[in-house]
């Protein structure tokens, strides 16, 4: 599973390890580098949906046809070094949010880059919307 690494990614280090070292590292050694929450998540094993997504990622890497983003509803998968360079479209409950995985995202969850909540900006309340607006002069 060879991966082309752009020049700007060669300088990247995760806990003192380069991207090439992370790609060649066994999964058990990589898990030891992660923070506790992600380490525990990976030690428990992959769910069936996470497993099918990882198989799909490996198939795309093997066939080297990574032109389209990989659509998924799986938000709980930790980003692994083998995902670097691929495009994902993660569902946020309403739509698919596209992003490309860069080395700085290793160790984060896919769902962190597909925010499901939008900030609500309310306008002015309308006439009779509140008790105090009953006594306001009519507009217009």
Swiss-Prot record:
The keyword Lipid biosynthesis does not apply. It holds the Pfam family Ribosomal_S19. InterPro entries: Ribosomal_uS19, Ribosomal_uS19_euk/arc, Ribosomal_uS19_SF. The keyword RNA-binding applies. One of its GO terms (molecular function) is structural constituent of ribosome. GO terms for cellular component: cytosolic small ribosomal subunit. Keywords: Ribonucleoprotein, Ribosomal protein, RNA-binding, rRNA-binding. One of its GO terms (biological process) is ribosomal small subunit assembly. Belongs to the universal ribosomal protein uS19 family. Protein S19 forms a complex with S13 that binds strongly to the 16S ribosomal RNA. This is Small ribosomal subunit protein uS19. It comes from Metallosphaera sedula (strain ATCC 51363 / DSM 5348 / JCM 9185 / NBRC 15509 / TH2).
